[in-house]
Design a protein with these regions (language model features):
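Residue-level detector of functionally pivotal "anchor" positions at catalytic/ligand-binding pockets or at interdomain
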Residues: 355-381
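Short, conserved, GDST-rich strand-edge loop motifs in beta-rich repeat architectures
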Residues: 45-64, 149, 155-162, 205-214, ...
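A short beta-strand motif characteristic of beta-propeller blades
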Residues: 20-26, 76-84, 118-129, 176-182, ...
């Protein structure tokens, strides 16, 4: 698990990384999301629905929703189609696998071939309630002999903006619903992860009502052994918009309260929130982590990308994509950014900003991070083994509340750290040296 220490200072922005000038690539109107598969890049654009009726009307000057495919080696578009069945929902939360696009359409799901853009099924699943609206899809896949197979869909849906929604697990094998559970108001994003026991858990971000401070992350474990799934509700803040999971840490983007709220998924604990520094309607949109370079990137409607270190809290800087950014992706040593709207305005933009990551730094940081440390616990003694010898290594032990309970420095390949006298529970051990930076989750128990 990566260090939580960056959360204390990442958004106190006084830029130390010089701003980069992006390369702008033309695309459709209002690009929302980017998805890379092998040597192709998929960009989903929502056009311009001038009267907001969901119907494309070219005679009124409207622009259609479109799906572009780019060559990842040349950054040139090779395919593009108009989405004939109308505009996308915002937030845009389709299900994407290595071969398929599962697109929510009110109470139905459309299925497309990802390489040919062919519509394979116009109604894979149809909810019985016509008022239901599918708001988010996540694809559960398995690997067999090196081949990825889509086995299930986790989908969220709602019937109103003020009542609780539902999460549903749908089998692509049996074409049956395996689980349905009530969650919070306006569920809109789903992710899966493996807990410390190796069990799959589903995390559902519920937006809540704007200004209501009732956004929540619902975590569901279907392997409880009781026949009834366990569900944990983690209260967040105002208007959750996006989240990522890195190891056992979820980082949730709160658009209404202008915060990033971290959640320790191992202990189901909400950690202290951090102000992003935006205000009004210019709040944070999405978050992405470069785990190799230990950097966090946050898109904001203040027309910038905010960057911080994921390891030690160092503020790195801001980049300006020349638009209001939405979705982001790392592709071939570049950060791709969707400019959904014009900078400082809400007129749909039609560009993607490419920021080339500094290659020398990029390679150097990855080489350093390949030096791993082995950490094990035995009878209350934590044994730390590194590949370094004769160099000082700083260590910090943090509990689930973010409190540092032990810290120090050792020199050599092995160090023994006593947990005796500390309460049983989960701790994060962070190591830092000139050549090593890593964090590990450990459990101290009887």
């Amino acid at each position: 698990m990566k260090s939580l220490s960056f959360l204390c200072s990442i958004f106190l922005f006084c830029s130390s990384l010089s701003s980069k000038e992006p390369q702008l690539i033309p695309t459709g109107y209002q690009p929302l999301a980017i998805h890379a598969v092998a040597d192709t890049i998929h960009v989903f654009c929502n056009g311009n629905d001038i009267d907001f009726d969901g119907v494309y009307e070219p005679l009124s000057g409207e622009k259609p929703a479109m799906w572009y495919i780019y060559d990842a080696n040349t950054n040139v578009p090779v395919k593009a189609i108009i989405m004939q069945n109308g505009y996308f929902d915002v937030p845009f939360r389709p299900g994407l696998s290595s071969t398929r696009l599962y697109l929510p359409r009110q109470n139905k799901i459309e299925v497309y071939d990802l390489s040919t853009q062919e519509l394979l099924d116009s109604s894979l699943l149809q909810l019985p309630d016509q008022k239901s609206k599918i708001t988010g899809i996540h694809v559960v896949s398995t690997q067999q002999s090196g081949v990825s197979n889509d086995v299930a869909l986790a989908l969220s849906h709602k019937t109103s903006f003020t009542e609780p929604g539902q999460i549903e697990i749908y089998s692509l094998i049996s074409r049956q619903t395996l689980l349905q559970k009530e969650v919070g108001i306006n569920p809109q994003m789903i992710r899966t992860y493996k807990n410390l026991l190796g069990q799959m858990e589903f995390a559902v971000l519920c937006e809540g009502t704007f200004g209501g401070r009732n956004s929540a992350l619902y975590v569901i474990n279907t392997a409880s052994g009781t026949g009834e799934p366990n569900m944990t509700i983690l209260e967040l803040g105002d208007t959750g918009n996006h989240f990522i999971i890195q190891d056992q840490l979820a980082l949730t983007v709160m658009n209404g309260s202008h915060e990033i709220i971290p959640v320790n998924l191992a202990t189901k604990t909400v950690l202290p929130s951090i102000s992003v520094g935006t205000s009004g309607y210019d709040g944070p949109r999405e978050i992405i982590v470069d785990t190799m370079a230990n950097r966090v990137y946050i898109s904001t409607y203040a027309s910038d990308i905010r960057i911080g270190s994921f390891t030690d809290g160092t503020v790195i800087g801001q980049w300006f994509p020349k638009g209001k950014p939405e979705g982001m992706a790392f592709i071939k040593n570049s950060l791709w950014v969707c400019n959904a709207f014009k900078s400082g305005d809400y007129v749909p933009d039609s560009t993607i900003a490419l920021f080339t990551l500094d290659e020398s730094t990029f390679i150097q940081e990855r080489a350093e991070l390949s030096l791993e440390a082995d950490i094990s616990m035995h009878e209350g003694i934590c044994i730390i083994k590194s590949q370094l010898e004769g160099e000082d290594i700083d260590y910090t032990v943090m509990n689930t509340k973010g409190t540092v309970v032990s810290q120090g420095t050792f020199n050599g390949k092995e160090h023994r750290l006593s947990f005796l006298g500390l309460p049983y529970g989960v701790y994060v051990i962070t190591l830092n040296s000139s050549k090593l930076s890593s964090s590990t989750l450990v459990i101290f128990r009887d």
